[in-house]
């Protein structure tokens, strides 16, 4: 697999599509499940595809991030506590997506961006993609 693999698709399930942004931590499970079923069906039609699925945080991470102001960066112990709260909230949505993927018989592995990206001034400086590339290379 190269960086320009024509069989690799990235599909982002937008946070405003899969959550109710007006209500904190409110997932639209029926929509998520339907989208994941569509993805599985596409993979069945074309087994050569490699699909990377991402999703936004919607009413999960964004509400918590606003509460703790983590967009301004983290440096103090209080900031890191806020960062942890945002991570926990975003992880809840990710667990819902992963659970629904399993229910749709779509095997997925989660790669949280917070574990692999390094930023400065809101710009990604480095993104460790080796684990993701290894999974994609092996099916």
Predicted regions and their residues:
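N-terminal glycine-/serine-/threonine-rich phosphate-binding loop
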Residues: 1-52
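General beta-strand structural signal in soluble alpha/beta enzymes
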Residues: 11, 52-55, 108-113
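Ligand-binding beta-strand-loop-alpha-helix segment within the catalytic cores
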Residues: 66-139
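Long, low-complexity, intrinsically disordered polar/charged segments
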Residues: 34-84, 104-106
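Short, active-site-adjacent cap segments at secondary-structure transitions
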Residues: 17-19, 58-62, 116-119
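Conserved active-site and cofactor/substrate-binding residues in soluble primary-metabolism enzymes
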Residues: 23-34, 55, 63, 88, ...
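Non-transmembrane, interaction-prone segments in cytosolic or luminal domains
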Residues: 12-13, 24-31, 43-45, 59-60, ...
């Amino acid at each position: 697999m190269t960086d320009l693999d024509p069989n690799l698709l990235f599909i982002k399930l937008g946070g405003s599509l899969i959550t109710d942004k007006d209500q904190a931590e409110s997932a639209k499970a029926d929509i998520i499940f339907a989208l994941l079923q569509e993805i599985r069906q596409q993979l069945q039609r074309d087994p050569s595809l490699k699909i990377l699925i991402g999703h936004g945080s919607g009413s999960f991470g964004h509400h918590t991030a606003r509460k703790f102001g983590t967009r301004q960066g983290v440096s103090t112990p209080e900031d890191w506590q806020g960062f942890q709260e945002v991570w926990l909230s975003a992880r809840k949505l990710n667990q819902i997506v992963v659970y629904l993927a399993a229910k749709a018989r779509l095997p997925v592995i989660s790669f949280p961006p917070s574990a692999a990206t390094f930023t400065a001034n809101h710009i990604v400086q480095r993104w460790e993609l080796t684990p993701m590339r290894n999974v994609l290379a092996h099916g």
